[in-house]
Amino acid sequence: MNAFKIILQSVNDVKDFVNTVSKFNYDIDLVSGRYVVDAKSIMGIFSLDLTKPIEVRVFADKFDNLLSELKRFII
């Protein structure tokens, strides 16, 4: 597992994030406090506190393409 932090500041950011991570076949979770949701679930993401940074957990060894596509969200 690999992890990094992101920030999603608008509804469009959430939509773009979900569309991007949905292209990848490996599991990706989002963690906010004690809550863990599937990063490919738009409804799950909206259940999180989006005013704070969110931890992304990627369950893959090689995910450089994902990082390059998400670089605008990474903090």
Each language-model region and where it sits:
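C-terminal structural segments of small proteins and small subunits
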Residues: 47-75
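Short glycine-enriched loop/turn motifs at secondary-structure junctions
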Residues: 1, 31, 48-52
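Glycine- and other small-residue-rich loops at beta-strand/loop junctions that grip anionic moieties
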Residues: 6, 34, 59
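Short glycine-/aliphatic-rich beta-strand segments at the starts of folded cytosolic domains
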Residues: 1-8
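Conserved short beta-strand edge segments in small beta-sheet-based binding/regulatory domains
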Residues: 29-33, 72-75
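Electropositive phosphate-/nucleotide-binding environments in soluble metabolic enzymes
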Residues: 8-11, 39, 60, 64
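Amphipathic alpha-helical interaction surfaces in cytosolic regulatory modules
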Residues: 11-27, 35-50
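Conserved beta-strand core positions
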Residues: 4, 26-28, 54
